[in-house]
Amino acid sequence: MTDNTRLRIAMQKSGRLSDDSRELLARCGIKINLHTQRLIAMAENMPIDILRVRDDDIPGLVMDGVVDLGIIGENVLEEELLNRRAQGEDPRYFTLRRLDFGGCRLSLATPIDEAWDGPLSLNGKRIATSYPHLLKRYLDQKGISFKSCLLNGSVEVAPRAGLADAICDLVSTGATLEANGLREVEVIYRSKACLIQRDGEMEESKQQLIDKLLTRIQGVIQARESKYIMMHAPTERLDEVIALLPGAERPTILPLAGDQQRVAMHMVSSETLFWETMEKLKALGASSILVLPIEKMME
């Protein structure tokens, strides 16, 4: 029998989001062996079960209340949402937060040797895609009629195979499109991974665990976006040094033994510290500049 006291989280078993989802759970302190082929993996230190499934199954598992949480790409979530609404359903769920990985874009692509004069170029054309509802919504808003060719894989080969005139598919670098004689012409949807929760009443113990998990996820994301910076800075130019780090909190200032002209500065910065910024800091007289990653962070 299913233990309803344990929090059930669905994540992609393998694919684009799998490794990042696994890393996120690990950095949140959830001890779990996700390197087996088992469908359900149980955490060692928390009442959490991880269901490892296909990514396009995750929205349905959450919307149908089979699992409590799901880590899923917004593109897959939105496609399932539109699909269910088209069937007259009223799917319910909560988006708890957007995550900092899984970024991609859903784009239209056409053969390189064909002219492109905007979306109207697709009027009456046949378009291959794995996202028919997202494609339809976009082109309907443009008032463009088209024929959809549903493919669940290798969408980029459709024009060469004579199956379609254009495609609508996920793009990261564009290298796959180029290798198949295609070019990206229009972005119709931008996506990242997100954490979603089922609708309906949640047991108090589960909700407390979800709140704890959200706090840890926030800490992990903040840590990844932040750096711990240490340097020696001239006392007369402290304000200028701090101004170069607009994302920083007020720094900790420490005296340097035997040096009245400089101080040691320690700070957490939420800004990416580029080489150019470090060079500007050095030009202001800063020295011994160290930029360190942060493992965990909680405000």
Swiss-Prot record:
Which key words are in the record? Amino-acid biosynthesis, ATP-binding, Cytoplasm, Glycosyltransferase, Histidine biosynthesis, Magnesium, Metal-binding, Nucleotide-binding, Transferase
- Quote the catalytic activity from the record: 1-(5-phospho-beta-D-ribosyl)-ATP + diphosphate = 5-phospho-alpha-D-ribose 1-diphosphate + ATP
Q: In which pathway does it act?
A: Amino-acid biosynthesis; L-histidine biosynthesis; L-histidine from 5-phospho-alpha-D-ribose 1-diphosphate: step 1/9
Taxonomic superkingdom: Bacteria
How activity is controlled: the entry says: Feedback inhibited by histidine.
- GO terms (BP aspect): L-histidine biosynthetic process
Q: Which Pfam families match?
A: HisG, HisG_C
Molecular function via GO: ATP binding; ATP phosphoribosyltransferase activity; magnesium ion binding
What PROSITE patterns does this protein map onto? ATP_P_PHORIBOSYLTR (PS01316)
Q: Which cofactor does it need?
A: Mg(2+)
UniProt xrefs under Gene3D superfamilies: 3.30.70.120, Periplasmic binding protein-like II
Provide GO CC annotations from the record.
Answer: cytoplasm
| Assigned EC number | 2.4.2.17
Location relative to the cell: Cytoplasm
Its annotated function is as follows: Catalyzes the condensation of ATP and 5-phosphoribose 1-diphosphate to form N'-(5'-phosphoribosyl)-ATP (PR-ATP). Has a crucial role in the pathway because the rate of histidine biosynthesis seems to be controlled primarily by regulation of HisG enzymatic activity.
- Family to which the UniProt record says this protein belongs: Belongs to the ATP phosphoribosyltransferase family. Long subfamily.
Q: How does it assemble?
A: Equilibrium between an active dimeric form, an inactive hexameric form and higher aggregates. Interconversion between the various forms is largely reversible and is influenced by the natural substrates and inhibitors of the enzyme.
**What PANTHER family does this protein's entry cite?**
ATP PHOSPHORIBOSYLTRANSFERASE (PTHR21403:SF8), ATP PHOSPHORIBOSYLTRANSFERASE ATP-PRTASE (PTHR21403)
The protein's name is ATP phosphoribosyltransferase
